[in-house]
């Protein structure tokens, strides 16, 4: 068993070099599913190793979700598969997680790619609107977090997140 802690602001992608761990080119951090499991089964990541966080509160929430997933993994020796991809669409810099199961509620974290006022954030699945939220503004320096209910999702079809 191993626990690696990386304390700092910028994602430490060099930890993944040579490990076979998939890295997201947009965040320069680990590629994770809704369980915060990386591309290597049983290896989990949260916090700034995924993407830069502006508030430690979000890091703490990710760590709690990761701990729950890691405990489930240790108990069952596996987690439900996450075949659905989550993609950053128009005006979105990146999204976390990059893969989901479609059968569990999860929190979507994202940053917009440019400052915007009076925005509409939309999550679609195969062109069908899953969530729409209006915001007075969105800034690249401020992470947005959105709870996504599994009941709103289909069991197949990738998701795209966009901001207009």
For the regions a protein language model found, what residue spans apply to each?
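Extended hydrophobic-aromatic, low-complexity segments
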Residues: 53-58, 119, 131-133
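Beta-strand-rich binding/interaction modules
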Residues: 117-127
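FAD-site-proximal beta/loop scaffold in flavoenzymes
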Residues: 2-53
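A conserved FAD-binding loop/helix module that cradles the flavin
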Residues: 46-90, 95
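Solvent-exposed, conformationally flexible loop/turn segments
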Residues: 103-105, 138-143
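Aromatic/hydrophobic beta-strand junction motif of beta-rich domains
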Residues: 106-115
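Solvent-exposed serine/threonine-rich low-complexity stretches and specific carbohydrate-binding patches
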Residues: 128-141
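Short, aromatic- and glycine-rich surface loops/edge beta-strands on solvent-exposed regions
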Residues: 108, 121-123, 148-164
């Amino acid at each position: 068993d191993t626990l690696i802690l990386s304390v700092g602001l910028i994602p430490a992608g060099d930890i993944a070099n040579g490990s076979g761990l998939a890295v997201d080119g947009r965040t320069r951090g680990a590629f994770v599913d809704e369980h915060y499991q990386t591309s290597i089964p049983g290896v989990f990541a949260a916090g700034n190793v995924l993407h830069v966080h502006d508030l430690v509160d979000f890091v703490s929430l990710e760590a709690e979700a990761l701990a729950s997933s890691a405990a489930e993994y240790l108990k069952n020796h596996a987690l439900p598969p996450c075949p659905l991809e989550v993609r950053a669409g128009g005006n979105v810099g990146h999204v976390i997680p990059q893969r989901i199961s479609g059968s569990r509620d999860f929190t979507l974290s994202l940053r917009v790619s440019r400052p915007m006022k009076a925005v509409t954030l939309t999550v679609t699945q195969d062109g069908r609107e899953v969530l729409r939220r209006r915001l007075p503004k969105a800034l690249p320096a401020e992470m947005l977090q959105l709870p996504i209910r599994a009941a709103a999702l289909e069991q197949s079809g990738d998701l795209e997140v966009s901001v207009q």
